[in-house]
Amino acid sequence: MVNKDNNYTNMQKTSYHNGTGNHPEHNDNEDYWNILLSDLKDSDNWSNKIALDFASGKGRNVSNMLSICNWNRVDGVDISEGNIEFCKTWYNAKLSDWYCNNGVDVSDLKDNEYDFIMSTIALQHIPVYDIRKSLITDLLRTLKPGGLFSFQMGFGEGLESPLGPRSAYYTNFYDANGTNSHHDVRVHNESDVIDDLKNIGFVNITTEVRESYSDSGHTHWIYVKAYKPQ
């Protein structure tokens, strides 16, 4: 278990308290639609099912998912109180529930609730392996058996960046003095992610490395898909 009262999470909560941007420019990323959300193209397969966006920001991904499938519900969870209050007001007519999490797990979410979980431009901002593992382990709990987790992280060589230092995948850098690209984690090889997800309990894990999009902090991104066992 990760202590909720740790330096990194406290810094994140302060940084994100009032909210973030909605990043509409990332809707123009073809890989967003053709890789991250590619499984949703078979829209009939998701009718009356339930999805979640982890680190949902101001609701862009939730709105996008609602627009392409006839879901029962698409929820959002985020560390920012400002973002969640914005979404509760702005999307009050949508088929969505919104949750503000504590930064180290998603304990307010039900077991075996979601058929599909996505996350983008989020996990790469957390240079603390123990926190990412705690979050991903808890997201697995909330997936239904056979459910899919599709996410993206920064990928490339070295730890240098024009935006600030990067940390390696298994590093625990609790004392980062900034988030949201100021001190990201960088995946150096696909096997780190695959092995980690297997150890957490996921199966049928696939990855795809592509050039990054509107992200000067990473030359490439890695897209990952992993399933909860049936």
For the regions a language model picked out, list residue spans one by one.
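A short beta-strand submotif of the Rossmann-like class I SAM-dependent methyltransferase core
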Residues: 119-122
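Short glycine-dipeptide loop
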Residues: 143-149
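A short acidic, Gly/Pro-enriched loop at the edge of an enzyme's catalytic core
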Residues: 108-117
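A short, conserved alpha-helix within the catalytic core of class I
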Residues: 126-138
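Class I S-adenosylmethionine-dependent transferase superfamily signal
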Residues: 65, 138-139
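Class I (Rossmann-like) S-adenosyl-L-methionine-dependent methyltransferase catalytic domain
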Residues: 1-46, 57-106, 129-130, 149-230
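Conserved beta-strand/loop positions that form the S-adenosyl-L-methionine
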Residues: 54
